[in-house]
Amino acid sequence: MNVSLARETKETKIALTFDPEGTGKVAVETGIPFFDHMLTGMARHGGFDLTCTVTGDLGVDSHHTIEDTGIVLGDAIKAAIGEGRGIRRFAHAIIPMDESLAQVALDCGGRGYLVYTGTFGARTLGNIPPDLFEHFFYTLCIHAGITAHIRFTGRNDHHQCEAMFKAFGIALGEALAKSGKTKEIPSTKGTF
């Protein structure tokens, strides 16, 4: 299901499309090159299509751009899930990048929650304060209704961050894939 959303505030203007049944076609332009690189890796390795154009108040800092991208992407994921009929719902990925390792486990069953374990050594990563990566995933998970457990270790901050985004993308792509076994909602409650 291809979802297109737009959101405009006094801080950001975002146009985004998300297709979990895509082929990994990506066109991302947030005005923050490192964030673009992370989102591109997430979508390409997750096998879903993502286009995202953001104009944000980067003269202030990157917080609003990153947070609002998480809001809109989360809303798009939630819309794509819909009732959840036929999706796998659960998935995980363990991804290395040289000395770094990222582990992501997801439940796309309508309950937004984030457990985030890992630290970066640098004060900025691609001119982004590292706490904004946790905030991005928190915002995305709350808006998408996804429970995510994210863990990462390593020595190189770039590698840790990239492995984390790729692992999230792979797990998301697998969780949203149609199971092929049933068209039912994957819940004993019968609903998310």
From Swiss-Prot:
First-listed, main subcellular location of the protein, grouped into a coarse class: cytoplasm
Pathway membership: Amino-acid biosynthesis; L-histidine biosynthesis; L-histidine from 5-phospho-alpha-D-ribose 1-diphosphate: step 6/9
UniProtKB keywords: Amino-acid biosynthesis, Cytoplasm, Histidine biosynthesis, Lyase
BP-aspect Gene Ontology terms: L-histidine biosynthetic process
InterPro entries: IGPD_sf, ImidazoleglycerolP_deHydtase, ImidazoleglycerP_deHydtase_CS, Ribosomal_Su5_D2-typ_SF
Lyase listed as a keyword: yes
GO molecular function, one term: imidazoleglycerol-phosphate dehydratase activity
Entry's Gene Ontology cellular component terms: cytoplasm
Keyword Metal-binding found: no
Catalyses which reaction(s): D-erythro-1-(imidazol-4-yl)glycerol 3-phosphate = 3-(imidazol-4-yl)-2-oxopropyl phosphate + H2O
CDD domains (alphabetical): IGPD (cd07914)
Localisation: Cytoplasm
Stated family: Belongs to the imidazoleglycerol-phosphate dehydratase family.
Protein name: Imidazoleglycerol-phosphate dehydratase
Source organism per UniProt: Methanoregula boonei (strain DSM 21154 / JCM 14090 / 6A8)
Lineage, broadest ranks: Archaea, Methanobacteriati, Methanobacteriota, Stenosarchaea group, Methanomicrobia
Gene: hisB
